[in-house]
Every structure is written in C-alpha cells, then in structure tokens.
C-alpha cells in the first residue's frame, strides 16, 4: 500500500510526537509546585511529595528517552529486532497508562478530597500546583494517544510471518 520510505516517515513522526508529548508531560509535572500561607503557616505543594506524581515524571521521561533512542537504530533491522521493539513499546505503553492512572487519582484527591477518609481538597489553597498537574495530565493523555497510535501502526506494518 505505502512505500517502505513512507511507512518509515509515518513511524518516525508518530514516535517523535509521542516522545515530545511525554517530555512535555514530564517537565510540566516536574515544575508543579506552589507555596501559600494558611492560618499563618507556610504550606508547600510539590510533585516530589507524592510518589504517584514522581512515577508519572519517571515514566514519561523514560518513554521520551527510549522513543528517541529507538530512532538511532537502523530501520533495516531484523524482524526479530522489530518484534522485540514492539514488545518493549507495549510494555512502555502499559507503564504510561499506569502512571497516568495513578497521577489522575491523586489529582482527583487534590481537587475534591475524600470526605469518607477525612481528606480535604488542596486545590483551593494551591491552585497553581493543581493547574500545572492538570496540564501535565493533559499532556500525558496526549502521550498515551500518540503512543498507542504508534503501536497500532507498528503492529499494522510488522510482517506477520518470518
């Protein structure tokens, strides 16, 4: 259907877009911090204080780096190498999904709290932090969409038989 060069270009564009979105998500989350005075006490909110947000940064940074490193591999690799790359991409996609889910759950707690557990919402006090986390989650969602498009395209173009 498409020439080998056209397939390669589409794969590279999808991979670079996914890597870029992952890098943006990681940087936005890493920049998430805010300080306010509440009842005379200084309160800080930083992504480092929540393990799931740290996981989100690490996962997106790893996906971004791995996606760019893969571009250095010659496109004329063996079918076995292509299949191994596909398996690695699937694993990284699952890590991305887990990181987004964990960070999203923490963002929900930050926004609405949990009345059953007695946890108060913090976004009223530290809106800048919550806005940056929300922006990082949007970028993380875009990363997953792009990454899964890349995966589907890789599966579609991978030869079925040895």
Swiss-Prot record:
The chain crosses the membrane at residues 8-28, 53-73, 84-104, 136-156. It is a multi-pass membrane protein. NCBIfam families: A_tha_TIGR01569. Residues 1-7, 74-83, 157-162 are cytoplasmic. Belongs to the Casparian strip membrane proteins (CASP) family. The keyword Cell membrane applies. The keyword Aminoacyl-tRNA synthetase does not apply. Residues 29-52, 105-135 are extracellular. One of its GO terms (cellular component) is plasma membrane. The lineage of its organism: Eukaryota, Viridiplantae, Streptophyta, Embryophyta, Tracheophyta. This is CASP-like protein 1C1-1. Keywords: Cell membrane, Membrane, Transmembrane, Transmembrane helix. InterPro entries: CASP/CASPL, CASP_dom, CASPL. It comes from the Eukaryota. It is found in: Cell membrane. Homodimer and heterodimers.
